[in-house]
């Protein structure tokens, strides 16, 4: 039953993401981070199933989106003032999803639960070469019709910093713009707002110009 609810939850989440590729849906940096509880720690519970079901139904009430779409990679510094200004409940700029919530979306074999969990662990996005993650980000950006990708390199995280070059080259080959931000996702004392503000606004300006020129 638990694994069955997990499959149902993921089905609703996929339905939600398919709709969000074209629609506006209010969100915040904090909500995107808290989704990790639903997609990982609490996946399979009745409450999480209700949550994803409500997402899939609720988004149908929202209008088509004509702003700038962003796919976020790795952690979100939810306290950062500039990022909050641009991505918290903003109709012009929308973070559609983060790859951390989509590290394994295949359906589980409920008739063989232990084998299903083993497969889930072995085939997880973070198990294996970084190339797997880079290719997944490209696929996700295309599916979400993203205008660009932002990768946040959390200080001390070798995985996020070490794979940036490969991610950049993979996205470049797919003609998808990438912004790499460095900082501390947890400790606001290590946040350099001036640098983040300058680089983010320049990146968003480029995306806006490209999107407007293609309209």
Roles of regions detected by a PLM:
Residues 1, 214-215:
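Polar low-complexity intrinsically disordered regions
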Residues 88-94, 99, 112-120, 124, ...:
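Hydrophobic alpha/beta core scaffold segments
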